[in-house]
């Protein structure tokens, strides 16, 4: 027996390979090896996006193959298991390289993002001069505002768009007026708390951002370091650079309006050199001021032409009593209106092509509240021609109800009835040649009368007209246009003086409301003769103005109260200077050169 056992033990290597013990042991090792390979295949399929590793030629898979000499090894089962399950990847990053495949694609998408500045030409114009931005305690918006167009975003990815403003350098500046340049004035002030303006449309998809112009027009700049409104805090007289940030959603965890913009692979920042600006509390460069007024649609109030007027014209615009309250129409105005109406064939710009008066055409001469005039004197009253007869011959049917009621009220006065005008016309001399009609614009309101003047000389053409005014109560005498000739320069220049009947030009009157009487005279060859002004202490405050061009004289009475009576309209003789006249100066006309005008009562 012992010999047999020794013989079995002493079997050769070839015989041992075919023994029962060897066959049973090799089957167990083969099954264990197959199970290990299947488990590794399943785990690698889950890690690799390209499919099963068996379909690829990745050399790493060769590390899973058993060693060629493994079948001949006689190691233990634990050694075989350790050898077969060990991963051939050298590091953890190599193992995760297959799973991190999309990361390079995301990084490449961030690199493809482009931001284009809108209104770049306007920014360049400001930059060439030296852009300035106003900052206030309450906050001031930027002009030009930052507007950008973004391209290259992933349409399905979510992004934040933000903006911040950072200092260009650590210097403080001052503006030198004689050279119109910004110069360094010292070191910058202490840093301000960081502020980030997150666009109100955030968070949005890349497709949404790319379909619109991203505007930061609601961003405000302030110098209040304690601001709690979310405005960007800046120091005055410092240079700053706006920046636009595109932040992917997965990198926005640290994004906050009161913290600096996070830095990482999912954040891309853009800036534009032409958007550098200097903060100020008031514009230093006048060129910047003018450019902002011209280009900023919200600065239209500063584009008023009156702001640019200087000298006497600005003073006259400021104080209305330096000039007449309204402008007298001239022949150029009628010509312009006629051209605007398409070259009407009538004799007047207020006449239609058939020669019929058009109240609507003359409505621009009157108040918008009641366009047609309240009342007109008939043509040739006081023997004054009215070539523009349509201005004098408007019928009652041509007026709106508001004008008709006023006309009826006017006609109720006996002094303004048709018979009164007939008497005025009958007392005048023969008709003279017609002249041009001038119609000033006045503001109509309630009509009242004027005080009754004293009796006038019998030869006065104004006697009848003065008599018609007796039915009106006391009011103010606002405008008086007076005229005289060289022969009567020493006589009373008063409008009711008898010497006016020998003058070569006539006074015509227009009764306006409130409580106004207007007289106009247009001498052909005016000249100015100065004499002292005489006023009575008990009478109304008087202001007389004479245009320097001498076209006509204007006298304006500004009463201190309605209780003042108009005794200044007193009779005077031809050889006595009136003591209650507006002004001793008068406009004379060369004898024989008559200039007339019609009467327009409103």
From Swiss-Prot:
Database matches in Pfam families: T-box (PF00907)
Major localization class: nucleus
InterPro entries reported for this sequence: p53-like_TF_DNA-bd_sf (IPR008967), T-box_DNA-bd (IPR046360), T-box_sf (IPR036960), TF_T-box (IPR001699), TF_T-box_CS (IPR018186)
Protein's UniProt keywords contain Glycosyltransferase: no
GO BP annotations, alphabetical order: embryonic cranial skeleton morphogenesis; embryonic skeletal system morphogenesis; negative regulation of transcription by RNA polymerase II; positive regulation of DNA-templated transcription
Disruption phenotype: Mice show a general reduction of bone size and changes of bone shape. In the forelimb skeleton, the scapula lacks the central region of the blade. Cartilaginous templates are already reduced in size and show a transient delay in ossification in mutant embryos. Mice show a significantly reduced proliferation of prehypertrophic chondrocytes as well as of mesenchymal precursor cells.
GO molecular function, a single term: DNA-binding transcription repressor activity, RNA polymerase II-specific
Skewed-composition ranges (Polar residues): 71-94
Region (Disordered): 43-95, 338-369, 425-444
Domain of life: Eukaryota
Keywords from the named record: DNA-binding, Nucleus, Phosphoprotein, Transcription, Transcription regulation
Composition skew (Low complexity), residue ranges: 346-369
DNA-binding region: 122-304
Subcellular location: Nucleus
Modified residues (Phosphothreonine): 330
Single GO cellular component term: nucleus
Protein purpose: Probable transcriptional regulator involved in the development of the skeleton of the limb, vertebral column and head. Acts by controlling the number of mesenchymal precursor cells and chondrocytes.
Oligomer and partners: Can form a heterodimer with TBX18.
Protein name, UniProt field: T-box transcription factor TBX15
Organism: Mus musculus (Mouse)
Gene: Tbx15
